[in-house]
């Protein structure tokens, strides 16, 4: 029987927001700050919300306008307190205003007559990557790269089984040692979970640690094994709090009277076949997790390769785009897709395009065709979808860009403005340099185009993505230059530790 293993899961607390606070010489735990690109309008997503601002029931991935609205609600209540204590000031408009505001939680808690304010920090993705790398190197002072798995930019799993006797420490002591060093070096605190498998370590961090008091530095560390998991979490709700259990899965479980992990475990005793009918092979994962089991260890997750065989580019436009400008964006996105395929030495069998229309098309009246509801419950025109299959798998820009433009023309209503565009390269496979030819195929021309793409890619990788651009990328409404300066769809910012103004 294999020896029981011990895993850590470590999550950096409100990572992006914490980096912005530290770089401003502010306390990440008491400073009200959101990371969001306000230049994109208030519909933009907040990439992070500081802990003190989350305390006002602002979720970590809210839209900026949702944070703005919640702060207005809080300030309406605080202003009443200021008026009652005669600390508000009456303006020339005859309305009461705060005499002062603060973005510091300690000041706000000690003086209920202060107005709640907050900092909106533009995202600096390169800076976050640099700090994440620095923190990863801290972990490597204690464990081997073979025993650590970066789950995301701010979260890692570590197999500490062999290190506990080496350091003569408990798992809790080793976790605290690493978290303390990260805090000392970067000013960023963390939450950690300890488990007898990866799943339990993750739940200890995500769920259990949230319900225990933090120390003076905001650090929380919780532990779970299979028995304590069943005792503490079998009745926990909602099910969406559990790792890898999304809303769709929960909806199907609840349709069968399953509302907790305890319900699922008991159902699996006699209803295992039914679970496989509902969820297919995923039922095995659900059943294992219901009982607190996870067969995969560090070696398995490190060797896992996603089975996806598509590459996609998506973009939400900053304003509604008319037909011609949207077509320009499609050509730009197809070019980006072409370079990604070229860099990965892949070819695609087809391209799928989805065009999402703006709600102004309905709001202005006159639109009487098919509609759908967006995530906010608003009525918008039904999105357009289409696919074009190539004569042979390809990554050539002349084919991908031109066929994408033709597909756009075929599926898009020219009378409507566009807000969202997604393009997918489907059934991608390794590029073996083989062309499907006929009497009319100029193979030398194809080879020349491929070599040109590779040369352009080399220049972009060495000197920057904006060193080689088409003239169309300088037209009004083009977004290629801006997107090339982004990481993950957000501003790369600076990496010098200096926050943007």
Locations of the language-model features?
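C-terminal hydrophobic structural anchor segments
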Residues: 405-461
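Short conserved micro-motifs at the rims of enzyme active sites and ligand-binding pockets
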Residues: 363-367, 433-437, 481
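Residues at or immediately flanking beta-strands
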Residues: 189-191, 352, 420-422
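Core structural elements
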Residues: 153-156, 347-362, 424-432
């Amino acid at each position: 029987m294999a020896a029981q293993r011990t895993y850590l899961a470590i999550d950096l607390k409100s990572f992006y927001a914490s980096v912005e606070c530290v770089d401003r010489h502010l306390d990440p735990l008491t400073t009200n700050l959101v990371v969001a690109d306000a230049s994109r309008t208030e519909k933009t997503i907040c990439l992070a919300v500081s802990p003190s601002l989350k305390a006002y029931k602002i979720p970590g991935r809210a839209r900026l306008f949702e944070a703005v609205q919640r702060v207005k609600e809080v300030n309406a209540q605080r202003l009443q307190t200021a008026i009652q204590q005669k600390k508000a000031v009456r303006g020339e408009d005859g309305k009461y205003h705060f005499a002062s505001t603060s973005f510091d939680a300690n000041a706000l808690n000690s003086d209920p007559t202060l107005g709640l304010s907050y900092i909106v920090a533009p995202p600096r993705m390169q800076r976050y990557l640099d700090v994440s790398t620095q923190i990863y190197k801290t972990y490597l002072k204690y464990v081997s790269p073979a025993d650590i798995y970066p789950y995301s930019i701010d979260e890692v799993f570590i197999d500490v089984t062999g290190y506990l006797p080496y350091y003569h420490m408990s798992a809790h002591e080793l976790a605290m040692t690493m978290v303390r060093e990260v805090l000392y070096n970067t000013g960023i605190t963390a939450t950690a979970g300890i488990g007898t498998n990866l799943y339990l370590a993750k739940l200890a961090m995500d769920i259990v640690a949230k319900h225990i008091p933090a120390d003076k530095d905001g650090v929380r560390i919780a532990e779970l094994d299979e028995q304590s998991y069943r005792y503490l979490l079998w009745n926990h709700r909602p099910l969406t709090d559990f790792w890898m259990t999304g809303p769709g899965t929960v909806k199907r479980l609840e349709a069968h009277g399953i509302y907790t992990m305890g319900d699922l475990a008991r159902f699996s005793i006699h209803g295992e076949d039914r679970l496989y009918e509902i969820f297919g092979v995923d039922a095995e994962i659900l059943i294992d997790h219901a009982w607190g089991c996870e067969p995969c260890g560090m070696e398995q997750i490190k060797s896992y390769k996603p089975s996806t065989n598509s590459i996609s580019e998506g973009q939400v436009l900053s304003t509604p785009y008319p037909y011609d400008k949207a077509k320009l964006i499609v050509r730009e996105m197809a070019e980006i897709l072409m370079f990604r395929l070229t860099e990965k030495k892949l070819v695609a069998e087809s391209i799928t395009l989805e065009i999402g229309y703006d709600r102004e098309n309905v709001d202005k009246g006159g639109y009487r065709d098919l509609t759908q509801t967006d995530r906010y419950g608003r009525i918008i025109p039904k999105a357009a979808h289409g696919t074009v299959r190539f004569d042979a798998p390809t990554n050539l820009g002349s084919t991908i860009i031109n066929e994408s433009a033709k597909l756009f023309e075929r599926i898009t209503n020219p009378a409507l403005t566009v807000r969202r565009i997604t393009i997918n390269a489907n059934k991608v496979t390794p590029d073996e340099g083989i062309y499907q030819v006929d009497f009319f195929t100029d193979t030398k021309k194809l080879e020349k185009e491929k070599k040109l793409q590779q040369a352009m890619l080399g220049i972009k990788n060495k000197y920057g993505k904006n060193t080689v651009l088409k003239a169309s990328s300088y037209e009004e409404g083009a977004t290629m230059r801006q997107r090339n300066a982004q990481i993950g769809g957000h501003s790369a910012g600076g990496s010098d530790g200096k926050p943007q103004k």
